[in-house]
Amino acid sequence: LRAQIGYGGMPRHRGGPIGLVDNVLNRDFAPKAPNQVWVTDITYIRTYEGWLFLAAVMDLYSRQIVGWATAPTMTRDLVLQALLAALWKRKPGPGVLVHSDQGSHFTSDDWQAFLKAHHMVPSMSRRGNCHDNAVAESFFSALKKERIKRRIYPNRATAASDVFDYIEMFYNPIRRHGSAGGVSPVEFERRNEQGGN
């Protein structure tokens, strides 16, 4: 019954990782300016229609979620859509470091080609070391504790709408972060942009 409503086992990648790269980030979670380091990851949200997968891209400088996407299945396209949203929103120069775990979506040829085409530098956590991507995972933890609270949404559209509300109406513009001087990510960037001019 669980498989019929989309709650089968979590998809697993068979075979060894193919596109592994070094851990360039090396837990340096404090870049000096925006668009130097982005971290990305995927989580899942329960609905009565089955899973809703969320891919998010965070700028480590301010902890702002700069790109995100949702989908009913966990595919390479999901992570590419989130990264494309970040590129569209931020329009960074070349050389942005994009850090992820070693999931098959991030080791895929499509992901690596996308990064190369947009002059981005790939970085990956070491295998089995969740602390290497701890900041991205802490965002998902906050989302689940502060908004989802173990609820099961009636459908994927409702869940996606709530994710939008949390990220765009609360997390980025309002939620305070100790790493951002006790202000929201949007406010942190605004203050530092004014201070730099």
Question: Where in this protein do the model-derived segments appear?
Answer:
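Charged DNA-binding/catalytic regions of mobile-element recombinases
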Residues: 1-197
